[in-house]
């Protein structure tokens, strides 16, 4: 059993009992009070300097940030998809020599592109317009445009450059042989060198070139500036961008070869 303690309220003297007079200040016994000890355990606060607190705090913050980013991404996804689609429409339109702003791309695309479909290597249709534009289903997209009353066929190109993928679109007249226009894009080619394939100065070199010679598919060669090649049409490559130019050369042949049956059919 705990011993009682008493304290003088006048001078603070403590003792095991309340005397008639305080031995220190002579205050009467009425000035003594019993010292009450708090037996309840002290509540411990959070130790913000502990490793556990740091780990828990960091984990909570990471979760909150991740949730916030995910929510933002979901909210912005429709706008991102619209921007991606308009960029694709701009590329397709540039391949028929039509350049428009992003906010005008959808309207101009709907005006000029009269049909679209997917084909297989035999030139047979295997997908509709939506599938051709989405590019998610296996096959080769064809976009049919009407420009000044004349039919143009647009085909997709895919390849690899020095530092990353190359892609683009090339259009031909209704003879399915003569190039009407082209547009090329890249991811990461060297600025001022390989990146020049994305400029009109390069794509315009293809206008009027032929994909077939005497009925045989040849594609269009990319050669070093000043050089030539026999037996097929060719254009000058990019000075200082040899590997990128070779990538475009291979991309044209490999991609257009998949369209050969379509280009020689009566579709």
Where are these regions (language model features)?
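Cys/His-coordinated zinc-binding microdomains
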Residues: 12, 26
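Gly/lys/ser-thr-rich phosphate-binding loops in alpha/beta enzymes
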Residues: 23-24, 30, 51
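Intrinsically disordered, low-complexity Ser/Thr-rich linker and spacer segments
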Residues: 35-43
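Flanking scaffold residues of small Cys/His-coordinated metal-binding clusters
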Residues: 2-3, 16-20
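The −1 position to Zn-ligating cysteines in a subset of zinc-ribbon hairpins
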Residues: 7, 21-24
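Short Cys/His-rich Zn2+-coordinating modules
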Residues: 2-10
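Flexible, solvent-exposed loop/hinge segments and secondary-structure transition points
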Residues: 42-267
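Short, non-ligating residues that shape and space the ligands of small metal-coordination modules
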Residues: 17-18, 29-34
